[in-house]
Amino acid sequence: MLADHQIPEQSMDEEERTSSRGWMREFKYPSNLRDITEEARISLSSVAHCGGVDELLHESSELAWRTNMSPPHRALFTFSKKTDISYVMLFLDYSRDESYCPQEVRIDLGDGTNDWWLKMYRRVDQPKGWVKIPIHDAFGNPLRVMSLQMTIMKNHEKGRDCVVRHFRVLGPFRSRYDSMNRMILGPSAVLEARPGTEPIKDAIMNHYQSMR
């Protein structure tokens, strides 16, 4: 449950950029994506006072996940079915959090907590804002998983606890595995995963609808 917090006033532009919806500004075609974070069951390896799942998912970056143990720190996202994932988005702020700010992150992907089949590593130096981590195969398609785990391996300045201000999981707006997509588009169903191809796909869909 969220405690009472005094959230500083910000300009509307800055408030939007730093909000949980601010990830949209990192993409040319944000309408191709959707936020699927809250479709998952989320568990955190440790939580400091007033810094748990509710704070991690809060709209404001003034609230955050705050850990309460030595690293590594883990956030586990478990989906109820196989789910297409396109990006993991982190909002980190070294200027505010300093030694609490993550520097080395690992993303594990799999079909369960005992079946991790891909590990991805990312290092960020003194980030201030959104960090984009693509979750794609060699052809640029989203990866289909049931579980995703972020492990914070190391903080800046060898800090112990960490602060993560936003964590969002993004999937494609339309899955290439949708039965309607496969029936109408055939091989073109993969277009939804490619940046800038939404107009092509819409044209195909509109043609189909006009012929029914």
Swiss-Prot record:
* Presence of keyword ATP-binding: no
Q: What happens when the gene is disrupted?
A: RNAi-mediated knockdown results in both viable and inviable embryos, but eventually animals display germline maintenance defects and become sterile.
- Cell cycle among keywords: yes
Q: Which UniProt keywords apply?
A: Cell cycle, Cell division, Developmental protein, Meiosis, Mitosis, Ubl conjugation pathway
Task: State the protein's name.
Answer: Anaphase-promoting complex subunit 10
Q: Which InterPro entries match?
A: APC10/Doc1, APC_su10/DOC_dom, Galactose-bd-like_sf
- Name of encoding gene: apc-10
Please give the subunit comment from the record.
The APC/C complex is probably composed of at least 12 subunits: apc-2, apc-10, apc-11, cdc-26, emb-1, emb-27, emb-30, mat-1, mat-2, mat-3, such-1 and gfi-3.
The metabolic or biological pathway listed in the UniProt record of this protein is:
Protein modification; protein ubiquitination
Function noted in UniProt = Probable component of the anaphase promoting complex/cyclosome (APC/C), a cell cycle-regulated E3 ubiquitin ligase that controls progression through mitosis and the G1 phase of the cell cycle. The APC/C complex acts by mediating ubiquitination and subsequent degradation of target proteins.
Domain DOC span(s) in chain numbering: 12-196
Q: What is the lineage of its organism?
A: Eukaryota, Metazoa, Ecdysozoa, Nematoda, Chromadorea
